[in-house]
Design a protein with these regions (language model features):
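Amphipathic helical "hinge" segments at domain boundaries
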Residues: 45-111
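N-terminal helix-turn-helix DNA-binding module of bacterial transcription factors
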Residues: 1-59, 340
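Short acidic/polar active-site loop segments enriched in Thr and Asp
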Residues: 13, 59, 123, 183-184, ...
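Short, well-structured alpha-helical segments in soluble
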Residues: 109-121, 231-244
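Flexible loop/hinge segments that line or gate small-molecule binding clefts
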Residues: 128-168, 254, 280-292
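Hinge/beta->alpha junction and helix N-cap segments in small-molecule ligand-binding domains
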Residues: 70-80, 100-108, 162-172, 188-234, ...
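Flexible loop/turn connectors
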Residues: 232-341
Length: 341
């Protein structure tokens, strides 16, 4: 059945039926309920293109996945697809469209966003890999495109976001390690121009201060986002020069794999001679023996929440919303308890 036939049965205009099925408030609740019951009875599913014409909106969510920089290795790409899985589950249940583009360079990424706005005419976008200052936010606001960010900039003014509690996660890890009598704790981060990396760095520094542990610059490592081999070489060198280190915190899953490689090359038994804890990824725990103890990162949940917030933006008097996922530690086999001295 098409919308024309359905509207005739209901004795309503096509526009009214379309807007009722889209949940617009200018159609009374009584009429919306009646239309929905008829649509269900006759198994009618709205044509998305017809809905666009009736509403004047594309009702499409755009997403750009860069395949360079932070996502240049397969581990991080897998993490993004878990977030996307959470997005698409909610998207499909709400009968809206999803358009994803890929970019191999920064220039391609810029053009991809321009294409989403000017060619595909999406009216909603999800941003990710937020920098401390991110020009994409200004661009989307200028073009009146609704958006939610996965992550935060250093300023939280006038936009909606979902994120993991990065500082809180590091504080939780530090507390966990200190309760197991570790105080020689190294931290492996990535370059801090990504705001989540900066937040985690701040969490590490604040935790050291709170737990009255003196900061040792030799215990902090900031690595570029490349393959795990690069971080492995740097971590190996750090451990050789600082033999008192008893635990390593890894800010990303690929550096966690690098830490394991470094420890193995130095014949350090993980979970006995040295402890390693990382931010969890959907595959990283399958790549290591013993399995990595990690901070759980609910990417699917964040993806779903991002879409829910985007949909709320169509309501009147919308104000920016945020969702901060609380961290939890998943204990596996890579952290040991030291004897108390």
């Amino acid at each position: 059945m098409d919308i024309r036939t359905l509207s005739k049965k209901l004795k309503l205009s096509i526009t009214t039926v379309s807007r009722a099925l889209s949940g617009y408030s200018d159609v009374s609740a009584k009429t919306r309920t009646r239309v929905e019951k008829f649509a269900k009875k006759y198994k009618y599913s709205p044509n998305p293109y017809a809905s666009r014409l009736a509403s004047g909106k594309s009702n499409t969510v755009g997403f750009v996945l860069p395949l360079y920089g932070l996502n240049s290795n397969n581990l991080n790409q897998t993490s993004f697809f878990e977030f996307i899985s959470g997005m698409t589950n909610t998207i499909h249940s709400e009968n809206i469209q999803f358009f994803m583009m890929f970019a191999n360079t920064a220039e391609e990424e810029k053009k991809a966003y321009e294409k989403l706005i000017y060619v595909q005419k999406v009216d909603k976008i999800i941003l990710h890999n937020l920098k401390k200052k991110d020009s994409r936010i200004k661009m989307l606001k200028k073009n009146n495109v609704k958006f939610v960010t996965w992550g935060r900039t250093e300023s939280l003014k006038n936009y909606s976001w979902v994120d993991l509690d990065n500082e809180g996660s590091i504080n939780l890890i530090m507390k966990y390690l200190i309760e197991k009598n570790h105080n020689q704790i190294a931290y492996i981060n990535i370059v801090e121009n990504y705001n989540f990396a900066f937040q985690r760095q701040q969490g590490y520094l604040k935790s050291l201060k709170n737990f009255k542990i003196k900061y040792n610059k030799n215990y902090y490592l900031s690595v570029k986002n490349e393959e795990p081999e690069e971080s492995a070489a740097l971590i190996k060198n750090m451990l050789k020069n600082n033999p008192k280190i008893t635990a390593i915190i890894c800010s990303t899953e690929y550096s966690g794999v690098g830490a394991i490689k470094a420890c193995n090359e130095l014949n350090k038994k993980i979970g006995k001679d040295i402890s390693v804890i990382t931010f969890d990824g959907p595959v990283v725990q399958l790549l290591t023996t013993p399995a990595l103890t990690a901070i759980s990162h609910p990417r699917k949940e964040l993806g779903s929440k991002a879409i829910e917030i985007l949909l709320d933006m169509d309501k009147k008097n919308y104000t920016p919303k945020s969702y901060l996922a609380k961290p939890k530690i998943v204990e596996r086999g890579t952290v040991n308890t030291l004897k108390k001295i």
